[in-house]
C-alpha cells in the first residue's frame, strides 16, 4: 500500500528553505517511507504514530505523522535536532488539535 505525502504549512515553509542537497536526501528517504512508513526504529517516544528521518551527516531531522485511516503521511517539522524537538509539541498542538 502506498501512502500519500502531505506537509503541514509550517513544515512546507521549512522545506523550501532547505539546501537543495538536503532536500534531495530527504526525498530519497521519503520515497522509501511512503511504501512502509511504520519503521519501529524511527518511532518517536511518547508520540503515537510519529516517526523521524535522520540525516546524521548533515544534522537534520524530519518528523512525520502517519494517519492510517486516510493513508497519509504528514511532514510536521524539519530542522536540526535541538530545534526540532523543541517545536514538535507546539506544532502538534497548533496544527492537529
What kind of region is each of these model predictions?
Residues 31-55:
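A short, surface-exposed loop/turn module that caps and links secondary-structure elements
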Residues 21-33:
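Compact soluble domain cores
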Residues 2-6, 10-13, 17, 24, ...:
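Enriched for short, Lys/Arg-rich terminal
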Residues 17-22, 42-46:
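Short, mixed-charge, low-aromatic patches
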